[in-house]
């Protein structure tokens, strides 16, 4: 297992990041029909994505359905194999980075202690044949981190942290509400004290009344346990208050990234402005004209140049000539747009 330092990749942050993603690509081949299928192209689900996740930060990854958010985080954690690129992770917190993309299946196993995932669906992500105690204890058992009384103590402690009673250990998932099931999933993800957690649409399947409770719980756990999150979301209004920074994705690329208040207050990329304008306003007396949405880009047949150009109200002749790079447009604010200044 090779070890890297910040000298091995260009820094996008002043302080050494916890995770540095560089030129990450995940392509899915398109094959023709027939007796002998031939590759005819690629679906570029994730296309040269680069960003840093800072220590004790919540980075929001937002965009429309199909833009590549979930594929990005699943590729980083090697639920999907890389097509190319790197994801440098400081697993031990000692400045020695490992690259998720080059690790073997055996080398990935100890990394799972430090990097975990909270899944979207609290109903299908829990084994209905296991008790709550068994579900939360399973990571500790697999990684041989605790047994006997110590195992029971850590499970009880984790259940209390997520707002569940230890006596629930003997019950099965079907006995709980959606919000309680998601708390069980959170307990399972955090019981090994990871440093980095992906929350993939972790509240989108819950009732609106429960979403705020789970979001606030995740924010409290971040402070208590020193966590760093990548939080995948499409409902900006629900999760805005826990994001430290926001990265906006479109057609497999990050088109803008900035601190939360900066991005919401001064969006630069036309797609970011469209996304923010499309968010519902909780005031029936406020009316506004919504921008024309247009057709979402096909990741298997992207147009030349900027993928958003066919939908962009500000598109010029140069937009179809080349793919814009993510460049600084302000302090800690980056955008991939030829008209950004």
Question: Can you describe what each PLM-predicted range is?
Answer:
Residues 2-17, 31-37, 42, 97, ...:
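Short catalytic/signature loops enriched in Gly
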Residues 198-202, 206-287:
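P-loop NTP-binding/switch modules centered on Walker-like glycine-rich loops
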Residues 92-96, 149-167, 276-277:
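Conserved ABC ATPase "signature" region
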Residues 191-195:
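A short, proline-enriched helix->beta-strand linker immediately N-terminal to the Walker B motif
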Residues 77:
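Helix-to-loop junction immediately C-terminal to a conserved catalytic motif
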């Amino acid at each position: 297992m090779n070890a890297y330092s910040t000298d091995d990749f260009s820094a996008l942050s002043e302080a050494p990041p916890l995770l540095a993603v560089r030129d990450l690509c995940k392509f899915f081949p398109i094959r023709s029909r027939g007796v002998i299928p031939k590759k005819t192209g690629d679906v570029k689900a994730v296309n040269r994505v680069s960003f840093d996740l800072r220590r004790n930060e919540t980075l929001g990854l937002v965009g429309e359905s199909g833009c590549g958010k979930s594929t990005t985080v699943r590729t980083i954690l090697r639920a999907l194999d890389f097509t190319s690129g790197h994801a440098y992770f400081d697993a031990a917190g000692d400045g020695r980075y490992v690259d998720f993309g080059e690790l073997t299946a055996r080398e990935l196993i100890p990394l799972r202690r430090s990097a975990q995932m909270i899944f979207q669906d609290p109903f299908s992500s829990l084994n209905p044949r296991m008790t709550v105690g068994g579900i939360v204890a399973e990571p500790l058992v697999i990684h041989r981190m605790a047994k006997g009384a110590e195992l029971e103590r850590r499970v009880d402690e984790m259940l209390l942290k997520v707002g569940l009673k230890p006596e629930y250990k003997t019950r099965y998932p079907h006995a709980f509400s959606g919000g309680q099931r998601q708390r069980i999933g959170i307990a399972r993800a955090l019981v090994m004290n990871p440093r980095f957690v992906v929350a993939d649409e972790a509240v989108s399947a819950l009732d609106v009344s429960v979403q705020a409770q789970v979001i606030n719980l995740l924010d409290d756990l971040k402070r208590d346990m020193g966590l760093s999150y990548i939080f995948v979301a499409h409902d900006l209004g629900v999760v805005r208050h826990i994001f430290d920074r926001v990265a906006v994705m479109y057609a497999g690329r990050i088109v803008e990234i900035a601190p939360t208040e900066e991005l919401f207050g001064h969006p630069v990329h036309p797609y970011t402005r469209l996304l923010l304008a499309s968010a519902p306003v909780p005031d029936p007396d406020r009316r506004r004209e919504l921008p024309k949405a247009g057709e979402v880009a096909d990741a298997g047949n992207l147009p030349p140049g900027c993928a958003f150009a066919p939908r962009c109200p500000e598109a010029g002749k140069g937009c179809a000539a080349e793919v814009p790079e993510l460049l600084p447009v302000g302090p800690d604010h980056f955008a991939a747009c030829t008209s950004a200044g």
